[in-house]
Amino acid sequence: MANYIVGDIQGCFDELMLLLAQCQFDKNVDTLWVAGDLVARGPKSLETLRFIKSLGDSAKVVLGNHDLHLIAVSLGIRNNKAKDKTAPIFASEDGNELLHWLRQQPLLAEHPKFVVCHAGISPQWDLATARLCAEEVESLLRSENYRWLIENMYCNQPDLWQDNLSGLDRYRYIINAFTRMRFCFADGRLDMDCKLPPSEVKESELMPWFTLPQRRALDKPVLFGHWAALEGYISEEVIGLDTGCVWNGSLTMIRWEDKQVFSQKALEN
């Protein structure tokens, strides 16, 4: 029985199938953890959703920014981005069922030995705070009021966590930290603009969220996706798994038990 954690799939379904064959994934005994962004610019977002959903309890999914955007598009709140290939989802007979299933997924998934989220965990949070914050937004997403949240989540402010944040300010920060964060300023403020590799950043105050000196200690390693420019990052405390399959890079997965990394080059689409 093994736990496999995969980075951003973004509709790269064929690569996912090859990757699972490579590691001999068995849905009857193994668990696949998906670090968000199941859908978007790859050619088979619909097939990806159907497959992951079909795994039932053998799949543990967290929501990414592209997944939330898909929900916004389904509600008419946002337009499909030009490069997104998600239209088949809306045209399919099971599209609404898949979207409902997606909306039930968490922002943070936890194993006794690790946690998985899409972008990361705010450097101002300990794990207990991260759990509580994730649950606040998850309960809204699963409620009848989810449209209100999706309609109002698009904002880069506030960029600094305070325990007394409330209402939309609180929800926006939580969503941005879990699904959009890459860099932070030295004082802990989130930067929502820079997507470069850390080595190319000229702004001296910017640093990856996981390298902030004052980052709260977590008692489990964090596995995340979202940041393709890292080209994979492995340390004792964090493991970044997005290696840009949708950008002609590769799809990367790690087996937790022995830390073996599996990689599948992007196919020509």
Curated annotation (Swiss-Prot):
Q: What class of enzyme is it?
A: hydrolase
GO MF entry, a single one: bis(5'-nucleosyl)-tetraphosphatase (symmetrical) activity
Keywords from the named record? Hydrolase
Q: What is its EC number?
A: 3.6.1.41
* SUPFAM superfamilies xrefs: Metallo-dependent phosphatases
Alphabetical list of CDD domains matching this protein? MPP_ApaH (cd07422)
Q: Is Hydrolase among this UniProt entry's keywords?
A: yes
Q: Mind telling me which InterPro entries this protein's record contains?
A: ApaH, Calcineurin-like_PHP_ApaH, Metallo-depent_PP-like
Q: Which PANTHER family match?
A: CYTOCHROME C5 (PTHR40942:SF4), PTHR40942
Q: What does this protein do?
A: Hydrolyzes diadenosine 5',5'''-P1,P4-tetraphosphate to yield ADP.
- Return the similarity comment: Belongs to the Ap4A hydrolase family.
Q: What is this protein called?
A: Bis(5'-nucleosyl)-tetraphosphatase, symmetrical
Q: What is the lineage of its organism?
A: Bacteria, Pseudomonadati, Pseudomonadota, Gammaproteobacteria, Vibrionales
